Structures are given as structure tokens and as C-alpha cells.
């Protein structure tokens, strides 16, 4: 493997441009309650740890977490991810467990936890994919929420200078340890720092990024350094004072995207900042939606030269993550207790958590998620998710979406306005959110389709109206399926693509 590096706004692996396609390994080394269906009452590692101690006792809880880390993500997962044609994973880490803080704030690795990072790196090297180190939970918390294991729901990384000093030393130690490892794709310095209700801390973010970069560069000149915007990695105004000269130091900017319009227009602030700084963009987190949204969004990133990392790879009993595991028998007793119900006896609670560990070891995969992300058949492509267009007719009022496109996008029920993409549980778009593509005579759109094995495919277009459609499969040469209207007017809902036996 070769070190990843940037050049003139493009990400390279050696001499070849590369688009990152990856999976976010959330829930492993920094568990989140919602991935266990605990939600807000037990939503972060420190509260989950307290629950285990409370219900099962100290000795059991300590052994549980050792078994959990050994089972949640294994070599089998990395092999499967690589086998799907993906090239990277992003590992969410918790500083509270990765490091021990001694007297006078001396920092050293916690070897038992570090072993899991090293194991993941070894698996990634074996299967030829990159590992990105993601500081998901920084000292004191950079977000002040469940996602950073915050103690007090305040981003204390920015209220206590001591926490910043400790973080600088942590990244320095990581860079020393992994500086000669080309399979480490880069260092993601802070996950989703500073939500907008704490924006008064925003002026501290760029100076901290600069300080962290200097500390890393003192010991590691080769690895990419990745900087996220504020407010769930969506506010790039924090980079207004960042210069192209600074950004030329193998820097990548990262944004996250959830539950919003999957169109180019929504990415404009990120693209504009990246162009000004002449750096690549990475969509480092996005997902937790439905197949339609995935089929719109992720191919769009690639069309724009933006790499991506899906979140989250594995969760309990969901239809919209690539890997899932069953809820163990008796789990409702745990969630009922969190809601104020009866406390399970220690022996009963231990048995339930033992079954939980068995469940995470015997999950199942959902390859349809990967097919949606990569546009591989069999799959269904929403008509509005076209990647190329040649539209002769004028745009009409309809869905306020893909605003700079010339094509008309209509709601099937005839209303106008913005689309609602909030499908947290993976449910399909409701009837009032069905979007149709209106094609008139002479209109032409192209949908990217990936067919690496050159399988024979069948394309069925679901449409309404009296117009005549022509479909041309040029995936072998152009990677596109072209749909055109040769006469009349027709409303297209989707392309259903199957593999012929």
C-alpha cells in the first residue's frame, strides 16, 4: 500500500487518483446507546458502562467490555467490507479509553484498548484497505453530546485549555506510533466539533487545528490530516481564515451529511471552500436513511470527485446498515428498566448481556445497502437521481430540489415545495414524497450504473403518461444507462434493474 496524498485538489494513491469508499466503524470502540436501541437515557459509553456495573456488578462489567471489543468488529467484518469493493474504514476512537492520563497530565497509551486499533490496522493491511483514525471522543468532549462521550453535555475541550494540551500530546503519540504505516489513510483530528448552540467556541477551532497539525508534522510529514467543519461537520465558515498555503500540507476537508437534499446545490458551501483552498473533500459520515436517499447521494459524491464513508456499518436490528444483529431475548427488560421499570436481578441481567454478546457475534449482512451506495445491480434507481442530462423542455414548478438542473421534478400527488428526506429508520419515502421526473420530447438523462462483472442486465422503467421512452444501456463503455423521450410527455418514477439469469 502507498501513502495517500493530495495534489491540486485531488486525492492520490501513489500516482493514481482515488475516490474513497468506506465504512464508519461506529459503535465499536466508542459505543453509542442508539445503536443498542437505548436512545437518550443511556446514550454514551460512560452511561452504558454505569448501567452494566449497576445491573451486573463490577467484575462482570469489566469482563463484558473485554468480550465486547473482541467481538463487535472482527477480521471477518474487514474482509467483508473489502470484498464489497470498498477501500477504507473510519475508526471512531474514545480518548478516555485509548489513553491513560497520569500525574502532571502525562499521556500514555492504554495497551488493552490500543490492541484493538492495532488489530484493525493489521486486518486492513491484510485486505488492502485504508484505516482512518477518527478522534470521536476527545478529552473533555469536542461536541458536548452523546457522540463524544461527554460527561456534562458541554464541549469541555474548549472550556479547559488543559484538555487541548492533552489532545495535542495524544495526536503526537498516535503520529509517532503510526507515522510509518501507509495503511493508515489519515488522521481525522476531531469528529463534529462544536454544535451551533455553542458557537461562541468556534473561534478556538482553527487555532486548535493549527496547533494539532504542527504537533503531528513535527513527527510525521507524510500522513493526511483531515479537518471537519463545526456544527456536525456542516459549518465551513470556521475555515474562512485558513489559507491555501496552510492547506497545501496534505490537508483534506471533511463534511457530514444526513437527512437533507441529496443534491449538488446542498454541497455548494463545502465545494466552494475546497476550491478556494485547493484541497479534496471527504464526506466522512452520512447514512441512516433509506435506499432511495443512498442511491441519490453517494453516486453524486463520486460524480463530484468526493470520497465517502458510510455511517454506521453495524447496528442492532435496522434495515439501513450493511451489518446488523438481532435484539437478544430479554432486552426489553433492560430498556424497560431505563424507562423506570423493574430492575432485573443480577443473574438475569448477566444472562441477557451474555445473549447480547452472542448476537453481535452472529450478525447478518445487507448487500442491498452496498448496491445502493455503489449503483450495482440489482437495484432501483429513482428517476430524479440522474447523473447526466440534456433537457430541451423548460423546468416547471414541482419539487424544490436539484434547483440548477433544467429537468422538471414533480411530486406524484401534485403539490409543490421542498422534499422531506428524514427517514431515520430506513423506511421508504411516503406517498406524498414520491418524486417523478417529467420528460418531454427530446429530453435525455443518464444514470450511472456500475457493472464490474459485465453481467447481462434487464432494465424496467416505471413511468406514467402517453409519451414514448427509449432506453439505451451504455454501461460497458460510458457507465451510463440513457433514458430519453422520443415523443409526447411522460413522468418517470424509477429504473428497476435486475440481472438476467
Q: Positions of the model-derived regions?
A:
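N-terminal carbohydrate-binding accessory modules
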Residues: 1-86
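Extracellular glycoside hydrolase catalytic/binding regions
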Residues: 2-3, 8, 162-312, 325-332
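An active-site-proximal structural segment forming one wall of the substrate-binding cleft
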Residues: 4, 60-89, 97-99, 103-141, ...
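Outer-envelope exported proteins of Gram-negative bacteria
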Residues: 22-23, 92, 130-136, 186-188, ...
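Charged, glycine/proline-rich intrinsically disordered loops and linkers
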Residues: 40-62, 328-347, 409-414, 421
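Short, solvent-exposed turn/loop segments enriched in Gly/Ser/Thr/Pro and often Arg
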Residues: 92-95, 135-143, 190-193, 229-231, ...
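Aromatic-rich peripheral "rim/lid" segments of glycoside hydrolase catalytic domains that contact
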Residues: 294-387, 392-394, 398-400, 404-406
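Extracytoplasmic
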Residues: 362-501
